[in-house]
């Protein structure tokens, strides 16, 4: 009812259930907006009807959608063309059809949401996926929003292609570890890293890893991330895992004596200098 039929009553009901009140839920929305780095968004209600202090931008809507697309249930709902739900108090169920015409008119369309108010005009957040590349297009106050959205998506698919920057299992670096073979643990990409790039565009790869690790470390243990992107923009994060193990040496009398003697001789040599 909320996403397929733009149910404002459903939005209010969900807000009260999750936030205790419309105002409480709006505060949660603004907190999440801050986490996403949305500089041009502020919410005062859950349904989007005009209100003082309630605003957003096309870029922020695209970022919100990218975050929402990480939720499998959201992705499933926004690409549902038709649904039948129980209708309390009636002998028959209620049918709901998605208002997003692109779902049946545009190749690869998989969302997202229509919207209209007199103040904002006809608005559409649209999404489509082809060859593993997901695009989001946002049109605001667009009388011909279907054609405009299709044109934006067409441009995106023509101008960009998905490129594999990292292969699954590829060694990208190492982390110092005293008990690892050679004194360092090799680090590998846990998944393939693919990002959309224009022709001739070169990506960057930055590693987020600890300065060192202590044993024991299991092979496959999470150690950090590889950041992929272009310019200054981060486009993807690939988990990094240990490509080998580091086992803590077992304590033995001989090993302990060896360490004590090594420390003693090192101290003695320093006193002679």
Language-model-detected regions and their locations in the chain:
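Domain-terminus/edge residues, biased toward the C-terminal soluble/receptor-binding domains
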Residues: 38-39, 50-55, 59-273
